[in-house]
């Protein structure tokens, strides 16, 4: 008993529980239990334990807790066990993540899709310079995300692929809204510039605004607000005054003074109103010129209600312009017959005047006044008959006056100057500025007049002087010898020589006649020259030029003849001058012949009282 009562055996007392915790082989038995089972206070050793036993389990508990926590973490990471109520305490390792997420919740993010905007607008928005400008202006960061996709590519889009869009991120909603509004303004300007007469293919850019880490559900309500603002409805109203009068400025009437009418519609409805088409002055960016369509008003608005209101105001404006044009046309119709101006032709009508007028879109209710053709000036009929008279030009007062615009009559060929038609035998002695002989009568005078206009065509100048036999002619020499007018030239020497031979016999006859009659008559001399002209038909062209010059010399002869006096010297001089005047020309009247020829002619001319 003593043994059992005096000394305790180790088998008599239970083993300390701490020994099981220190053994690593016992740990798998704890796995089916919860993670906090081995941390519960009931597992503590009993109070009867010694101090040594208490100190040993305290160090073992810390080690066991660390190992258990590591194992539990590994199991939860693999998903074999689910976290319990103690899990928030266990996830204290990424404890700073919630604070970081909370700071990110303050950033507002918006996405503006620009995949379907016009090319020029898309290129402008994707430029870094434009995005930097938007960032400086709004305070939000703008970047390009996604890639451009066509309609076919968008239909086959993958889960991780998105169309081209702009990523806007800011600290507050106001900064993001400011950047988005700027982007919308750029897109609106690009759409308006690229709009054409056909229906637009741009459906608008979608804008998505959300908080980055937040779920999609709370962000859905503001999304339609931004998306609806970018969907533009468009319409156009044709003016309908393509064939208006050129003096009626349709563009100015529609736009108003300084585009005030269209600006008023924009302020009232908030729509974009522009004038486009032919004559609008709006240059299309694609073609670089005006559209081929007739003039129309282009209307664009984000909402259909605003578009309808703007369209109604534009219709009222066009009605006012049409009524004003009708008043303008009526005013022209009432004033045109009074002033006598011709109006432009109707639509599809052939103009009655050679002037071109643009086709008009109205019907003129009055007869078109055609300007009368200018009446031709009254032509004074006159007939140029064969004149019989002096070749001297008539007085200016005698020539019949005619109207200035009268054109020459092609049926009556005339020559200018037209000689004065006078009765036979009439003369104009008042026009004699030189000692000419009075005009002869009859056939000889007619031949002179008809050939007078041809003198200017046959005049020739030479430095040679033909030899002549009548060297006894005396008179005044007109001008130098080398510039003397020789008429038709040297072929005339044959006639001159023949006439000179005949003049010798005539001088003898006249000398015999002078003894009986004093003074000798001058007319028989000219009468005797007519047979001489007829006797030389081979020189018809030569004889046509001489009669005028013979008349000049004859005039000089009568001017030198003295009718009173009985001096034989005067008779001799008279005979010499008479023979020279009847045969010589005006160009050799004063030529001095050699002394040998003068002596030969002086022999038959001695006075009658010295005759043997």
Curated annotation (Swiss-Prot):
SUPFAM superfamilies recorded for this chain?
A: Eukaryotic type KH-domain (KH-domain type I)
Annotated segments matching region Disordered: 510-542, 565-612
Among InterPro entries, the record links this protein to:
KH_1_KHDC4/BBP-like, KH_dom_type_1_sf, KHDC4_KH-I_first, KHDC4_KH-I_second, PRP5/DDX46/KHDC4_KH, RIK/BLOM7
Query: What is the protein's known function?
Result: RNA-binding protein involved in pre-mRNA splicing. Interacts with the PRP19C/Prp19 complex/NTC/Nineteen complex which is part of the spliceosome. Involved in regulating splice site selection. Binds preferentially RNA with A/C rich sequences and poly-C stretches.
Q: Where in the cell is it found?
A: Nucleus; Cytoplasm
Its organism's taxonomic lineage begins at: Eukaryota, Metazoa, Chordata, Craniata, Vertebrata
- Which species does the entry assign this protein to? Xenopus tropicalis (Western clawed frog)
Which domain of life, per UniProt?
Answer: Eukaryota
Under Gene3D superfamilies, the record lists: K Homology domain, type 1 (3.30.1370.10)
According to its record, what are the GO cellular component terms?
Answer: cytoplasm; nucleus
Reproduce the free-text note on domains from the UniProt record: The C-terminal part is necessary for the interaction with the PRP19C/Prp19 complex/NTC/Nineteen complex. The KH domains mediate RNA-binding.
Q: Which residues form the KH domain?
A: 105-185, 237-319
Ranges in coiled-coil conformation: none
Alphabetized, the UniProt keywords read: Cytoplasm, mRNA processing, mRNA splicing, Nucleus, Phosphoprotein, RNA-binding
Q: What segment(s) does the record annotate as region Required for nuclear retention?
A: 477-545
Q: Which gene encodes it?
A: khdc4
The principal localisation class reads nucleus
Q: Which family does it belong to?
A: Belongs to the KHDC4 family.
MF-aspect GO terms = RNA binding
Q: What Pfam families does the entry give?
A: KH-I_KHDC4-BBP, KH_12
Record GO biological process? mRNA splice site recognition
Q: Report quaternary structure and partners.
A: Interacts with PRPF19.
**What is this protein's name?**
KH homology domain-containing protein 4
């Amino acid at each position: 008993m003593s043994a059992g009562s005096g000394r305790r055996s180790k088998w008599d007392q239970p083993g300390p529980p701490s020994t099981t915790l220190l053994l690593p082989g016992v740990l798998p038995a704890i796995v089916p239990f919860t993670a906090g089972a081995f941390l519960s206070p009931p597992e503590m050793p009993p109070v009867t334990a010694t101090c040594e036993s208490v100190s040993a389990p305290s160090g073992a508990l810390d080690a066991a807790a660390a190992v258990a926590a590591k194992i539990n973490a590994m199991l939860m990471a693999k998903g074999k066990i689910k976290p319990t109520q103690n899990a928030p305490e266990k996830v204290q390792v990424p404890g700073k993540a919630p604070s970081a997420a909370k700071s990110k919740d303050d950033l507002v993010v918006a996405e503006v899709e620009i995949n379907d905007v016009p090319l020029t607008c898309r290129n402008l928005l994707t430029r870094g310079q434009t995005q930097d400008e938007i960032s400086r202006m709004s305070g939000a960061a703008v970047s390009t995300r996604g890639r451009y996709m066509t309609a076919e590519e968008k239909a086959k889009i993958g889960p991780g692929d998105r169309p081209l869009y702009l990523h806007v991120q800011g600290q507050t909603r106001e900064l993001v809204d400011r950047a988005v509004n700027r982007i919308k303004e750029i897109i609106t300007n690009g759409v308006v510039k690229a709009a054409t007469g056909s229906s637009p293919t741009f459906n608008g850019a979608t804008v998505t605004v959300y908080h980055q880490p937040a779920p999609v559900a709370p962000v859905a309500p503001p999304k339609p607000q931004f998306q609806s603002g970018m969907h533009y409805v468009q319409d156009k109203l044709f003016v309908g005054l393509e064939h208006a009068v050129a003096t009626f400025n349709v563009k100015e009437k529609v736009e108003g003074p300084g585009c005030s009418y269209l600006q008023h519609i924009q302020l009232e409805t908030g729509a974009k109103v522009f004038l486009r088409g032919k004559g609008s002055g709006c240059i299309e960016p694609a073609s670089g010129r005006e559209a081929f369509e007739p003039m129309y008003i282009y209307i664009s608005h984000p909402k259909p209600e605003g578009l309808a209101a703007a369209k109604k105001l534009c219709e009222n404006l066009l009605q006012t312009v049409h009524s004003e044009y009708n008043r303008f046309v009526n005013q022209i119709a009432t004033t045109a017959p009074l002033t006598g101006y011709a109006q432009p032709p109707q639509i599809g009508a052939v103009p009655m005047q050679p002037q071109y007028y643009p086709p008009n879109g109205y019907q003129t209710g009055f007869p078109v006044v055609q300007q009368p053709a200018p009446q031709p000036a009254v032509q004074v009929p006159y007939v140029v008959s064969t004149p019989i008279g002096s070749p001297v030009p008539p007085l200016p007062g005698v020539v019949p006056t005619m109207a200035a615009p009268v054109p020459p009559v092609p049926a009556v060929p005339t020559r200018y100057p037209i000689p004065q038609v006078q009765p036979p035998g009439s003369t104009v002695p008042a026009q004699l500025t030189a000692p000419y002989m009075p005009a002869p009568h009859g056939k000889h005078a007619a031949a002179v007049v008809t050939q007078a206009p041809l003198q200017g065509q046959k005049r020739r100048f030479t430095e040679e002087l033909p030899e002549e036999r009548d060297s006894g002619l005396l008179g005044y020499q007109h001008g130098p010898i080398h510039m003397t007018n020789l008429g038709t030239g040297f072929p005339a020497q044959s006639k001159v020589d023949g006439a000179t031979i005949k003049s010798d016999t005539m001088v003898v006859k006249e000398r015999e006649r002078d003894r009986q009659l004093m003074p000798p008559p001058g007319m028989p001399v000219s009468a005797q020259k007519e047979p001489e002209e007829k006797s030389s038909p081979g020189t018809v062209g030569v004889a046509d030029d001489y009669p005028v010059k013979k008349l000049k010399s004859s005039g000089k002869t009568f001017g030198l003849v003295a009718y009173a006096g009985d001096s034989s010297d005067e008779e001799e001089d008279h005979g010499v001058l008479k023979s020279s005047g009847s045969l010589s020309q005006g160009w050799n009247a004063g030529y001095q012949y050699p002394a040998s020829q003068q002596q030969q002619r002086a022999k038959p001319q001695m006075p009658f009282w010295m005759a043997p």
